[in-house]
Amino acid sequence: KLIDKKKNTAKVAFNSDLQKIYSTVTQKSFTAAETLIKNLIDFGRSIRLILDTYFPIVARRLGDHWVSDKLTFAEVTLALANLQLLNSKFEPLYLSGLKSSQIRSKILLVVPTGEDHTFGAISVARKLRSMGTQTILLLDYQNKELEDLILGETLDLIGISSGNNFMTEKINALSTFLTSRIGKKTPIALGGNLV
């Protein structure tokens, strides 16, 4: 659902919308970016289009522009922080418009220590919550925290999110750490650009 049909709509100018979001988050003004998102919603863009399509494309573009030296690491970090703040600000609106299932699965999403790509995991956590799951997102953790969590909770799935090829050894070690504590009773899945 790209357009909210209950609102007066303007023609969706996909590339223009993306450029406006990109520009506002890179200008380090959260207030301007928040106003832009509200305006896009007022003009009929659905929150699903914005959070599920626009934000991931903008995040990828920011990463590409860092790799190609069009933006500095600091500029990308600040822009992604703005994007993540927008994501958390508008997530309640996103979740309010979706019907949750009757299944109340409990899922743990782990972003391995050292992984610097977190936007995908945050987006996946939002999507899973919208489906009625109880989703725990674990970032920048200590092994003791992770161990206490997996031993203290009944989990239906553990997801590992990674976007870096250099994380293979850490992911294997994390998987071994998890299975040595929970056995094979809880499935472990890997997702992200690495896959």
Label every model-predicted segment.
Residues P56, P112-E115, L194:
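Short glycine-enriched loops at secondary-structure junctions
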Residues K1-L95:
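Long amphipathic alpha-helical segments
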